């Protein structure tokens, strides 16, 4: 009696749903060893990422992100098949730490080669790009002592170190530009917005290592609704004491109209968001104006238990109308510097 009860509890019969067709299996590196012995290549990035689809966990989510991004790219083909004549608009959002890191060069590649149409970033995502043109950022350690670093004029971003002299160079570089912008505002009636301000910085830096430079060259707008929340805000603050008869004025309302108009006029919309916070919400909310995006890829390490926007999965945005109910969507949980270069290698750069 006891044995029968226990067996009934343990050996419950399975009823496999019809949609469970993919068996879990990892990459067989032996196969690629044999190919190398025959004079061929080892495993390629595309083959590795394809194998992720059957590994499970976040590997499968990364595979799905690659699949979704490649579908976005297919809809951006300049000569698409007739059934895909509605060209997709791709929105890219990223946080400032990614520009501080070597992900900057990955992002620059996307902008240089016109892989995306609209960008949203934070103030740091703007200023750190310029600052890197003026002085290097170094790899340090997460555990360096903050008090000692401060005494040496070294700023820590995770395990990255930015000499404070770089920000001094930034001030020297940007102040003459702010002077010219104020002059144009007062004498020519130039109406500045955060995005036109960023575009001007891209023009002035004139450096091919810069994301902003390529955005200027390729006419890709960069929006930053929290532009004053960083070193740029410090510079604007200091400049108010020198500007006459009035300081530089940036019209954020004009930018929200332009940002939302990109979404409203998009035939189809895909969003790629690296990190969370303002960049994530700004892009998603713009897509609300068109009843949601058709494709969505989130990559961040935040969880949803605290109700944060950063932690929210794409399905939460579906409830708000920011992503369509039938959209292709995925969230990859992980750190962007580890994941995004691999994703780009399997999509835009393949």
UniProtKB/Swiss-Prot annotation:
Keywords: Hypusine biosynthesis, NAD, Transferase. It catalyses: [eIF5A protein]-L-lysine + spermidine = [eIF5A protein]-deoxyhypusine + propane-1,3-diamine. Its cofactor is NAD(+). Pathway: Protein modification; eIF5A hypusination. GO terms for cellular component: cytoplasm; cytosol; nucleus. Gene3D superfamilies: Deoxyhypusine synthase (3.40.910.10). Its EC number is 2.5.1.46. GO terms for molecular function: deoxyhypusine synthase activity. The active site is at 322 (nucleophile). Coiled coil: none annotated. Spermidine binds at residues 127-128, 234, 281, 307-309, 316-322. It holds the Pfam family DS. One of its GO terms (biological process) is regulation of cytoplasmic translation. It comes from the Eukaryota. NAD(+) binds at residues 96-100, 122-124, 128, 229, 276, 301-302, 335-336. Belongs to the deoxyhypusine synthase family. Catalyzes the NAD-dependent oxidative cleavage of spermidine and the subsequent transfer of the butylamine moiety of spermidine to the epsilon-amino group of a specific lysine residue of the eIF-5A precursor protein to form the intermediate deoxyhypusine residue. This is Probable deoxyhypusine synthase. It comes from Schizosaccharomyces pombe (strain 972 / ATCC 24843) (Fission yeast).
